Amino acid sequence: MIRIGTRGSLLATTQAGGVRDALIARGHPAELVTITTAGDRSSGPIESLGVGVFTTALREAIEEGRVDAAVHSHKDLPTADDPRFAVAAIPARNDPRDAVVARDGLVLAELPPGSLVGTSSPRRAAQLRALGLGLEIRPLRGNLDTRLNRVSSGDLDAIVVARAGLARLGRLGDVTETLEPVQMLPAPAQGALAVECRAGDSRLAAVLAELDDADTRASVTAERALLAELEAGCSAPVGAIAEVVESIDEDGRIFEELSLRGCVAALDGSDVIRASGIGTPGRARELGLSVAAELFELGARELMSGARHDPARGN
């Protein structure tokens, strides 16, 4: 029996349940073990809680032998590799885009100036401000139902959340607008899961690897390499999206390329620096580093140093 560690929220158990079911379907008995994390116990702003707030307890459970593997939202994992653990599988990604849930079925552009929009993310807040719509950004914590209720109760005019989370809970009917990357670049690895186990557990790693999706792994690798190079941690105002696309060469042969778009935004929305690049899936990390270097050349370091010392970040 493979014991799979998961956070206790409905979204987390739904995600981990999908991994469990996929393993069982392949003939590998598996069960979920709920682990409470520091992020679940705190009601403070996510960016004030530190990197790894949702993952440390799950990793401790692996290390102590209480579980064999853990399922993380990949974007919650620290960008620095931990030699004690291995990401044995990155399953096929859900939709990485952000989504708006607004009152009266409105889209962002239809909300009047001064409307209250909730988000848990400095990245979303910065890009929302950059749209120049005069929206008032408010902090947002709690599970998805709690967040959605803040709109239905009239407390907020809209919220912006990951579309993947709504999809996994069967709540896509609440979405009033899906934000394309040109409007808002998602968080690196948004919509992707990471299935992690002990680094030395090669037998279990081989079993978990049956769930791995090569295109998703390449995309996530590029996005997180960009994030790591920018030294941003998971709450900094950095967006990135990569995808494997088919191209045709001069001889009419189809081949795969990996495209990557990235951005760094000033927290007040006064500036958004964007860069993009194309590489191959086999050199995903190099593509991430290349686009990060271009962002630095365009002034990302100055923008990010301002973000790190912004009092709104609490650090």
UniProtKB/Swiss-Prot annotation:
Binds 1 dipyrromethane group covalently. Its cofactor is dipyrromethane. One of its GO terms (cellular component) is cytoplasm. SUPFAM superfamilies: Periplasmic binding protein-like II (SSF53850), Porphobilinogen deaminase (hydroxymethylbilane synthase), C-terminal domain (SSF54782). Its EC number is 2.5.1.61. Gene3D superfamilies: Periplasmic binding protein-like II (3.40.190.10), Porphobilinogen deaminase, C-terminal domain (3.30.160.40). Keywords: Porphyrin biosynthesis, Transferase. It catalyses: 4 porphobilinogen + H2O = hydroxymethylbilane + 4 NH4(+). Pathway: Porphyrin-containing compound metabolism; protoporphyrin-IX biosynthesis; coproporphyrinogen-III from 5-aminolevulinate: step 2/4. The modification S-(dipyrrolylmethanemethyl)cysteine is found at residue 234. InterPro entries: HemC, Porphobilin_deaminase_cofac_BS, Porphobilin_deaminase_N, Porphobilinogen_deaminase_C, Porphobilinogen_deaminase_C_sf. Monomer. Belongs to the HMBS family. NCBIfam families: hemC (TIGR00212). Tetrapolymerization of the monopyrrole PBG into the hydroxymethylbilane pre-uroporphyrinogen in several discrete steps. This is Porphobilinogen deaminase. It comes from Mycolicibacterium paratuberculosis (strain ATCC BAA-968 / K-10).
